[in-house]
Design a protein with these regions (language model features):
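An exposed, glycine/acidic-rich loop-and-rim segment of catalytic or binding clefts
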Residues: 1-320
Length: 320
């Protein structure tokens, strides 16, 4: 048996990944009971997020030397979050290709959509590789200079029963992270993870870290921080690993993205409890257009944005 994947046209959403464990399957993603529930979603459950994943400070930035005001949708901060109130996560995508092992979606975002310049054509492809691996590929092209930062917002829970993720073990192949300011955004500062609760270079139990006294955790109610991945990750190194000792399921993630936003599911809302799932949003740094020292998220006409995220699942011996 191999993994089984379920997708939705709305948000080009990754709804379900069922992983074989013994004679049964474990769905490792949080999902709503009915497909119609996704139309009211407020936490981006499994969705493709864009045009810009993460927050942009007050929705204000500059492109081609001119000021741009984006639509803001995060009520408690006034920021533009995940592309605005009608971003990619809240749109119906067209199926451009379909076969037994892959589906490709396409969405055309008009010039000025949510305040972003340029007509942007975006494609998201989900492809099964072998029996235990799912590859997600994002591509985008524009007719004028704009900013692009795409990711998937799946909430993972590798346990085989209805429980949270605090018993999960997490490894992030990163020696650097970006602290948050009081406005829930990176401040442009980069810190070493060494000798801090942000050191996930070896697998760590989330429960041990989540309840450690730390001002950064207090700001976000847990983890909601960006980690810069080590350089060797893009050369087929493992970017992150999640393991559940309860189910025995291990997920290794590979990517060519420069970093990952780790969100410990601090605020989910009904029907979910806090920390029912965790997010690993592989992407560029939030608010990059307003900071110096990070890789540019500018996409120019004639160029192609292309990024991949690969999820590999295994069940460790003794748990089958």
């Amino acid at each position: 048996m191999g993994i089984e994947v379920e997708l939705l046209d709305y948000g080009a959403t990754l709804k379900s990944i069922r992983v074989p464990v013994g004679d049964n399957f474990v769905d490792v993603l949080l999902s709503y009971p009915a497909n119609e529930d996704y139309l009211q979603d407020k936490v981006y459950l499994g969705a493709t997020v864009g045009r810009y994943a993460g927050r942009i400070d007050s929705g204000a930035t500059r492109v081609q030397g001119r000021s741009i005001q984006l639509e803001c949708n995060e009520q408690n901060t006034g920021h533009c979050l995940h592309g605005g109130p009608k971003g990619f996560s809240h749109q119906f995508w067209s199926v451009s290709e379909r076969s037994s092992d892959h589906v490709s979606y396409e969405y055309v975002s008009a010039d000025g959509d949510q305040g972003f310049p340029g007509c942007l054509t975006t494609r998201v492809s989900y492809r099964l590789l072998g029996s235990n691996t799912l590859q997600i590929e994002f591509t985008a092209e524009t007719d004028q200079e704009t900013i692009v930062n795409l990711s998937n917002h799946a909430y993972f829970n590798l346990n085989c029963i209805d429980s949270g993720v605090e018993n999960h073990e997490l490894m992030i192949n990163s020696g650097l992270y970006t602290p948050l300011g009081s406005n829930s955004l990176p401040m442009g500062e980069i810190k070493q993870v060494a000798d801090s609760i942000f050191d996930f270079r070896q697998k760590r139990c989330l429960r041990e870290r989540l309840y450690s006294p730390d001002a950064q955790l207090d700001l976000a109610g847990g983890f909601d921080h960006y980690f810069l991945l080590n350089k060797d990750v893009s050369k087929a190194g493992v970017a992150a690993t999640v393991y559940s000792p309860q189910s025995g399921i291990m997920m290794n993630i590979y990517t060519d993205q420069p970093g990952v936003q780790f969100y410990s599911g601090n605020w989910l809302g009904a029907p979910f409890k806090p920390r029912a799932g965790l997010c690993l949003e592989f992407q560029d740094v939030p608010n990059e257009p307003n900071m110096d020292g990070f890789a540019s998220t500018i996409l120019r006409a004639g160029d192609t944005y292309r990024r991949q995220i690969t999820l590999e699942f295994n069940c460790l011996p003794g748990n089958r």
